[in-house]
Amino acid sequence: MIETYNQPSPRSAATGLPVRMKIFMYLLTIFLITQMIGSALFAVYLHRRLDKIEDERNLHEDFVFMKTIQRCNTGERSLSLLNCEEIKSQFEGFVKDIMLNKEEKKKENSFEMQKGDQNPQIAAHVISEASSKTTSVLQWAEKGYYTMSNNLVTLENGKQLTVKRQGLYYIYAQVTFCSNREASSQAPFIASLCLKSPGRFERILLRAANTHSSAKPCGQQSIHLGGVFELQPGASVFVNVTDPSQVSHGTGFTSFGLLKL
């Protein structure tokens, strides 16, 4: 009887090598990443620390400079034989520059204020007054949503806006009227924007007309006037109509105003 014996093959020593290599590479990667993060944090810390040291050094230099000026003013002499005259001249020049900058800023602010005073905003907006039904020159009142910016424009006698500053003005008027009332004549309803200058005759700046209507009830119609004109100090503007009894004085119907450009 022949017996066969199979000898087991020896275990390869290289089977554990890949596992060890993976562990080594993993640890090496973690080490490199940690080192990179640590280096970045250290760089940030070092940069901030250097900035802080630089600020402290500048403050120290300023402190030394001020102490040196104090010693020069008191007549003391340091061991380094500092040139007090040169240091004083540098300090005086520095202070002079600061004062000049302040003076320039003050002049700029003063110029802006003077410019605002020279060109103030002038505006006015007034509302019609019902008492103007008996006169061809419409009357106005400072009521409701009115505007009177300052004393450079005034409402005189309730009839005219007078300006005290020369310039270009946008002047406007809106007149609303009832067109089917019994009119004294068959002539169209006419609204005129007029100017009265000091020492001159009155003259018409703008004029608009609208025909009467037979519609009932009362048919409200509006006339709009507006334009840009050069006004002299003391000039007055007013609104004239052919039939004041037809003018509507309800809220927002009839108004008058100007604005300096």
Curated annotation (Swiss-Prot):
Q: Which segments cross the bilayer?
A: 23-43
Disulfide-linked positions: C178-C218
Pfam families per the UniProt record, alphabetical: TNF
Q: How is it modified after translation?
A: The soluble form derives from the membrane form by proteolytic processing.
A GO biological process held by the record: platelet activation
- Which keywords label this protein? Cell membrane, Cytokine, Disulfide bond, Glycoprotein, Membrane, Secreted, Signal-anchor, Transmembrane, Transmembrane helix
Stored Gene3D superfamilies: 2.60.120.40
Location in the cell reads: Cell membrane; Cell surface
Q: Does the keyword Transmembrane apply?
A: yes
Residues on Extracellular side? 44-261
Per the record, what ranges lie on the membrane's Cytoplasmic side? 1-22
- In chain numbering, where does the site feature Cleavage fall? E112, M113
Task: State any single GO MF term.
Answer: tumor necrosis factor receptor binding
Q: Name one GO cellular component term.
A: extracellular space
* Glycan-carrying positions: N240
| Ranges of residues in domain THD | 122-261
What is the protein's membrane topology class? Single-pass type II membrane protein
Q: How does it assemble?
A: Homotrimer. Interacts with CD28. CD40 ligand, soluble form: Exists as either a monomer or a homotrimer. Forms a ternary complex between CD40 and integrins for CD40-CD40LG signaling.
> What exactly does this protein do?
Cytokine that acts as a ligand to CD40/TNFRSF5. Costimulates T-cell proliferation and cytokine production. Its cross-linking on T-cells generates a costimulatory signal which enhances the production of IL4 and IL10 in conjunction with the TCR/CD3 ligation and CD28 costimulation. Induces the activation of NF-kappa-B. Induces the activation of kinases MAPK8 and PAK2 in T-cells. Mediates B-cell proliferation in the absence of co-stimulus as well as IgE production in the presence of IL4. Involved in immunoglobulin class switching.
Q: Which PANTHER family match?
A: CD40 LIGAND (PTHR11471:SF5), TUMOR NECROSIS FACTOR FAMILY MEMBER (PTHR11471)
Give the family, as the similarity comment puts it: Belongs to the tumor necrosis factor family.
What is the name of the protein in this document?
A: CD40 ligand
